A protein has these predicted regions:
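Beta-sheet-dominated scaffold domains
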Residues: 3-7, 12, 56-57, 65, ...
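N-terminal beta-propeller domains
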Residues: 34-116
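Disordered, low-complexity "stalk" and linker segments at domain junctions of extracellular
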Residues: 1-55, 59
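Surface-exposed loop/turn elements that mediate protein-protein interactions on large endomembrane-trafficking
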Residues: 20-36, 66-88, 115-126, 158-174
Length: 178
């Protein structure tokens, strides 16, 4: 789940990997999120496993029909996918297993690769590879700890360390090979 406040009302959104993501407000009123219709991205977010908020957009991933795609909403509206208003989708070249917002970027963990999405809107979102050599075994292992991201890789626990240079990251191993 993810908490957010786009319109002055606290809400949280739940994605279960089978149904449409559901938004709950403070009075526990539920609204399903779906995408279809003119001007909207072609891929539905029904069945999303992962949902994160970054730069006032809602990002959805892990749909079984498009496991390599991230769909994002227009700014400040979790269920509007009109491409002419700032929504869109991005594909990576591996199956997505988890998402994590870290230092104002969205880290996209895949089975065999890790990517970083930077920017603040459709016009300047950029995906850069963090590594194409190792991925994440299970997205539920991605955790922020002591100012770093830790995740379970095929060879043990690893970190995505932010270095002193802005926008630069490095990978480190913190366990013996598994």
């Amino acid at each position: 789940f993810e908490t957010f406040n786009f319109d002055g009302n606290d809400k949280f959104i739940v994605a279960d990997g089978n149904n449409a993501p559901t938004v709950f407000n403070t009075s526990f009123s539920a609204t399903d999120v779906s995408s279809a219709g003119s001007g909207e991205v072609s891929t539905a977010v029904t069945g999303a496993k992962f949902v994160k908020v970054l730069k006032n957009h809602m990002f959805y991933a892990g749909m079984s029909s498009t496991p390599q795609e991230i769909v994002f909403s227009v700014p400040f509206d979790e269920d509007n996918f009109a491409t002419g208003s700032g929504a869109g989708s991005i594909k990576v070249d591996d199956t997505i297993v988890g998402l994590k917002v870290f230092r104002q970027d969205l880290f996209i963990f895949c089975e065999n690769r890790i990517f970083k999405l930077s920017g603040s809107s459709l016009s300047d979102f950029v995906i850069t590879p963090v590594t194409r050599d190792i991925g994440c075994v299970n997205g539920q292992t991605i955790q922020e700890f002591a100012g770093d991201l830790i995740f379970l890789a095929p060879d043990g626990l690893r970190t995505v360390a932010g270095t002193a240079r802005i926008g630069d990251v490095e990978l480190g191993t913190i366990s013996a090979n598994v």
